[in-house]
Amino acid sequence: MDHTPRELEEKFWKALKSDRTLMLGLDGVEDGHARPMTALTEGESGPLWFFTSVDNAMVQQLPQGSRAVAAFVAKDHDLFASIKGTLHRDDNRAVVDRLWNPFVAAWYEGGKDDPKLALLRLDAEDAEIWLNGSSMLAGVKMLLGVDPKQDYKDKVANVDLR
């Protein structure tokens, strides 16, 4: 089945809404060390929001407008994405209010006014998204003479997330 870049992007946003965890790192900081972070969104596109703590090493090392890279794997390993963008600390109270939920609240003793609460915003610019077909199916196709490179070419796309 052929997939357009737009279809792959839609699959990415849908998978992110259900799985939420990705690995987030700053370009050129700590040799690109990435941390698992829970992404929250407000629709079918970015930005990606992350609740964290002011004592998180990423927050402490974050100059405003830092280049960031995130890696995402859907829970069933059927979709992968490498996301690039700009990461900002953005403690916007209106956004905190909109995104606040019981799972976030569990991390902050002081609630929305906890002095350790920090909110990060990833303005995603582009991503490379891969759909992963069943490796068993790929093996069967190869036995039947199907070129796996040709079969896979419509399952990867570079998409603009702005």
How would you name each of these model-derived features?
Residues M1-T21, R162:
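N-terminal leader/targeting segments and the immediate start of mature chains
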Residues K11, E30-P36, V59:
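Positively charged, polar, low-complexity stretches
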Residues K14-V29, R67-F72:
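A short, Trp-centered hydrophobic/proline-enriched beta-strand micro-motif
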Residues E44-W49:
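Short active-site oxyanion
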Residues F51-S53:
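Short His-Asn-centered micro-motif
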Residues A57-M58, I129:
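Short beta-strands and strand-coil junctions in structured, solvent-facing domains, enriched
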Residues M58-A124:
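Short, structured beta-strand-loop surface elements
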Residues D113-R162:
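C-terminal edge-of-domain segments
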